[in-house]
A protein has these predicted regions:
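ABC-family P-loop ATPase nucleotide-binding domain
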Residues: 1-28
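ABC family nucleotide-binding domain
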Residues: 19-169
Length: 169
């Protein structure tokens, strides 16, 4: 595995770093006998942006899927504000409601509107009511400037607009 880490930090002038928001400790992931990640360690501090750069097949997406609990790591720990995120679905749902990731592929459903795409995950993953999912989707779409497009089909959007819908989701 040839995984290269580059970390850039963005902070307001005079901002002091605090405790890590996310801590990854000795995270390893194997698929059968194939070890994809081996004892990865890093923290995400308040105000930091982490950029992961590596060759194709080096484990970047697998790492992010483990951090977002879309994959279960073989060993190691993921902590959110010091609390380990285990395999209990409620803990995972609470964690996912606070931490999001946008992958290179937006994975928007073309047979659904922008609003329906945003509501789907909160309904299926976080088990929110239709009303709660609607309110949350509208709030997030407003935050990314996509509220005027709630009835649009993803095929009608530019790449940047699709990216913003994926962030809102």
């Amino acid at each position: 595995m040839h995984l290269q880490w580059n970390i850039w930090t963005i902070r307001k002038e005079g901002e002091i770093m605090g405790d890590a928001i996310i801590s990854v400790e000795e995270l390893s992931k194997s698929f059968g006998q194939h070890e994809v990640l081996r004892k990865i360690d890093f923290n995400v501090e308040p105000g930091e942006i982490i950029c992961i750069v590596g060759s194709s097949g080096s484990g970047k997406s697998t790492l992010l899927r483990c951090i977002n609990k879309l994959e279960t790591q073989t060993s190691g720990k993921i902590r959110y504000h010091g609390k380990e995120i285990g395999a209990v679905q409620k803990e995972i749902n609470d964690y996912r409601s606070k931490v999001g990731m946008v992958f290179q592929s937006f994975n928007l459903f073309n047979n659904m509107t922008v609003l329906q795409n945003c509501m789907l995950c909160t309904r299926k993953v976080l088990h929110l009511s239709k009303e709660e999912a609607f309110d949350r989707a509208i709030t997030h779409l407003k935050q990314v400037g996509m509220a005027p497009f709630i009835n649009a089909n993803p095929t009608q959007l530019s790449g940047g607009q699709k990216q913003r819908v994926a962030i809102a989701r």
